[in-house]
């Protein structure tokens, strides 16, 4: 199903009626975990150590046109080729749509040099220990308060995230809640290290004394053992909102939905949708739709910026499987489309930013 050029819809498409031409607000939740330091598990940084800077640098780039916590702009490097951070996609789309951008600290080890809402200040641990997140229910409850407040200021809330190694922690939560997500979460690299992710998750579950599905009635235990702090923060924002919420992200957002379903088995997803990029939706190494359909009737909106037509070589790396999504890129592009901006104009603006701020 396609209603706008560059947009594919998986699901009923009914959600769009409530968010088209509405005042919107975009908030990005930033978080880090020690899991991202495991070699080979993520490409969201030039080295495992630098992944801790990626979320802060991403939102600083959107606000200030340049990172302040790092001398260089975050990028994913595979075989010598650098793919620009998805923050440039988010920045371009939000500028064109004239949508306000906010930041929430869900647990970032490096705090961004921008004004932000403090939901949680403690980063996540290494999920292999089985002790990943401190007080996840408290994080969720603070997210609820943020969702209630922000939804009183707008007609449509879009929530993105920047959490290196977030697909691994998503796999952990999905598995603990009983979902079949093995070999289905995406990755920021062309090679998806499924075996490593599963090994890391199983080590965490073992050390926490948890079997697959054990946490279906104890959802916060799943996050505490093998999750990340972004997941309960964003679940809280979404469940606290009184207006439609677009979860802007890839397979990490299915873990958010799974947590919401476990907290409230009767949760109605008709006012909640996932928006992502074509690079996630058509990734042969993952399956966001198969995960989502296990959880509920969740519309997924997929934006294709047609980077094959881009002249900037770094953007071609997205076509080769690098990056795919992040910082709410898919949701930001959806916002631009909903505000009547053609996808070609979004791509052109992305290229302009790549040629100026990434030069």
Swiss-Prot record:
GO terms for molecular function: nicotinate-nucleotide-dimethylbenzimidazole phosphoribosyltransferase activity. It comes from the Archaea. CDD domains: DMB-PRT_CobT. InterPro entries: Nict_dMeBzImd_PRibTrfase, Nict_dMeBzImd_PRibTrfase_arc, Nict_dMeBzImd_PRibTrfase_sf. Belongs to the UPF0284 family. NCBIfam families: nicotinate mononucleotide-dependent phosphoribosyltransferase CobT (TIGR00303), PRK04447.1-5 (NF003372). This is UPF0284 protein MTH_1426.
């Amino acid at each position: 199903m396609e209603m706008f050029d560059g947009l594919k819809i998986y699901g009923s498409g009914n959600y769009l009626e409530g968010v088209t031409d509405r005042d919107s607000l975009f908030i990005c939740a930033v978080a880090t975990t020690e899991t991202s330091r495991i070699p080979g598990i993520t490409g969201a940084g030039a080295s495992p150590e630098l992944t801790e800077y990626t979320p802060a640098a991403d939102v600083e780039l959107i606000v200030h046109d340049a990172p302040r916590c790092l001398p260089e702009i975050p990028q994913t490097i595979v075989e010598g080729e650098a793919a620009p951070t998805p923050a440039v996609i988010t920045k371009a789309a939000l500028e064109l749509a004239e949508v306000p951008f906010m930041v929430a600290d869900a647990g970032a080890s490096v705090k961004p040099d921008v004004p932000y809402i403090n939901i949680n200040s403690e980063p996540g641990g290494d999920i292999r220990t089985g002790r990943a997140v401190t007080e996840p229910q408290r994080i969720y409850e603070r997210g609820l308060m943020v969702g209630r407040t922000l939804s009183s200021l707008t007609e449509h809330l879009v929530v993105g995230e920047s959490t290196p190694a977030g697909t691994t922690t998503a796999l952990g939560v999905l598995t603990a809640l009983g979902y079949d997500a093995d070999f289905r979460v995406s990755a920021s690299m062309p090679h998806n290290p499924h075996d490593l992710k599963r090994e890391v998750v199983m080590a965490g579950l073992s050390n926490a004394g948890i079997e697959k599905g054990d946490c279906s009635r104890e959802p916060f235990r799943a996050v505490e053992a093998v999750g990340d702090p972004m997941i309960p923060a964003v679940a809280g924002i979404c469940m606290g909102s009184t207006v439609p919420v677009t979860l802007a992200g890839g397979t990490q957002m299915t873990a958010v939905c799974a947590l919401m379903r476990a907290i409230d088995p009767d949760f109605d997803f008709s006012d909640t949708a996932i928006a992502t990029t074509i690079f996630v939706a058509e990734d042969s190494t993952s399956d966001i739709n198969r995960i989502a359909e296990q959880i509920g009737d969740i519309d997924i909106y997929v934006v294709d910026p047609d980077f094959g037509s881009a002249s900037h070589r770094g953007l071609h790396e997205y076509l080769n499987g690098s990056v795919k999504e992040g910082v709410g890129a898919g949701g930001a592009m959806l916002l631009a489309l909903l505000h009547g901006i053609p996808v070609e104009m979004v791509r052109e603006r992305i290229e302009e930013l790549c040629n100026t701020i990434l030069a």
